From Swiss-Prot:
Belongs to the TRAFAC class translation factor GTPase superfamily. Classic translation factor GTPase family. EF-Tu/EF-1A subfamily. Residues 136-139 are annotated as: G4. This is Elongation factor Tu. Monomer. Its main location: cytoplasm. Gene3D superfamilies: P-loop containing nucleotide triphosphate hydrolases, Translation factors.
Length: 396
């Protein structure tokens, strides 16, 4: 049977479930696909189909992730759910599944637990912009006051990590009851309330093509009589012939003009997000540009050396280090297309970092990189990946 054609008529939004183990993330995911597919079409997925999440690799790290999709009246959602806590940590840090918003699942019977807290912190660190709460297992709590107490706790926890705890939509329900077709307030109607909250609270993400132009430079050539050409894949935005652009990173920032865009040996008047192009630069010498720099819209991104980040350190089984590392560890940081050496400072009270851990760190690079919060990187030793990370805050 052929899969239904993917209709691009509705805007596309990426979401995922986060929260403590056994609070009902996978059951909720199954309930959403089951109930929304009845009303808007799409494919219902059973719990065990989602729970048997396939392995995938992101930046050399193996992650188990289940991908489902569903529709609401106004949108198409791609939704990720992970079976284990470690998978969430890896997923969020590597950005394997970028989330425009997250659904925090919290059991009303248990209240916030350690991983509830950790996932909120991770969401903050890796730049998940919006969180919606599904207060699950409400059928197990008879006391209305207890429900209110748990809701208050969750709101306080969100505020503590700089999310707008007072304004975040909290939907009360029971994913299991909804899956069973229960029509009471906490059954199927709760899933529709959640869908409405997703539609109204998470803004439609800006498309890559509408963002300011950025192209990570992969190669540089000199073409006699024409000048210098840099090649790479346009990450976002559009570059038009005749536009002023900047070369940022590694060396001092310089301005130049795009005098030509080439794709598959054909001349174009512009290159856009997703295109693999060659960009001809006016008056730029071959030796003034190198792999690891970026071409960008002037002023849209700046070079930095000093930042805080959240990293996941590969375990020995994943091909990572066999031993811990300590303060002032100096690996290479692989940003976009190149390695830059940097030193790591660990948080106070953290003596060392073991393979398989995740930790907040401060990094000082020996050369500046075009950087913004949310940028992903790999940590490498002699060309082999030993960790993955994301820029949380730029210091300078």
């Amino acid at each position: 049977m052929a899969k239904g054609k993917f209709e691009r008529t509705k805007p596309h939004v990426n979401v995922g479930t986060i929260g403590h183990v056994d609070h009902g993330k996978t059951t909720l995911t199954a309930a959403i696909t089951t109930i929304l597919s009845k009303k808007f079409g799409g494919e219902a997925k059973a719990y065990d189909q989602i729970d048997a999440a396939p392995e995938e690799k992101a930046r050399g790290i193996t992650i188990n992730t289940a991908h489902v999709e569903y529709e609401t009246a106004t949108r198409h959602y791609a939704h990720v759910d992970c079976p284990g806590h470690a998978d969430y940590v890896k997923n969020m840090i590597t950005g394997a599944a970028q989330m425009d918003g997250a659904i925090l699942v919290c059991s009303a019977a248990d209240g916030p637990m350690p991983q509830t807290r950790e996932h909120i912190l991770l969401a903050r660190q890796v730049g998940v912009p919006y969180i919606i709460v599904f207060l699950n297992k409400c059928d197990m709590v008879d006391d209305e006051e207890l429900l209110e107490l748990v809701e208050m706790e969750v709101r306080e926890l969100l505020s503590k990590y700089d999310f707008p705890g007072d304004d975040i939509p909290i939907v009360k329900g029971s994913a299991l009851k909804a899956l069973e077709g229960d029509q009471s307030d906490i059954g199927e109607p709760a899933i529709f309330r959640l869908a409405d909250a997703l539609d109204s609270y998470i803004p439609t993400p800006e498309r890559a093509i509408d963002k300011p132009f950025l192209l990570p430079i992969e190669d540089v050539f000199s073409i006699s009589g024409r000048g210098t050409v840099v090649t790479g894949r346009v990450e976002r935005g559009i570059v038009k012939v005749g536009e002023e652009i900047e070369i940022v990173g590694i060396k001092p920032t310089v301005k130049t003009t795009c005098t030509g865009v080439e794709m598959f040996r054909k001349l174009l008047d512009q290159g856009q997000a997703g295109d693999n192009v060659g960009v001809l630069l006016r008056g730029t010498k071959r030796e003034d540009v190198e792999r690891g720099q970026v071409l960008c819209k002037p002023g849209s991104i700046t070079p930095h050396t000093h930042f805080t980040g959240e990293i996941y350190v590969l375990s020995k089984e994943e091909g990572g280090r066999h031993t811990p590392f300590f303060n002032n560890y100096r690996p290479q940081f692989y940003f976009r297309t190149t390695d830059v050496t940097g030193s790591i400072s660990l948080p106070e009270g953290t003596e060392m970092v073991m393979p398989g851990d995740n930790v907040s760190i401060t990094v000082k690079l020996i050369a500046p990189i075009a950087m913004e919060e949310g940028l992903r990187f790999a940590i490498r030793e002699g060309g082999r990946t030993v960790g993955a990370g994301v820029v949380a805050k730029i210091i300078e």
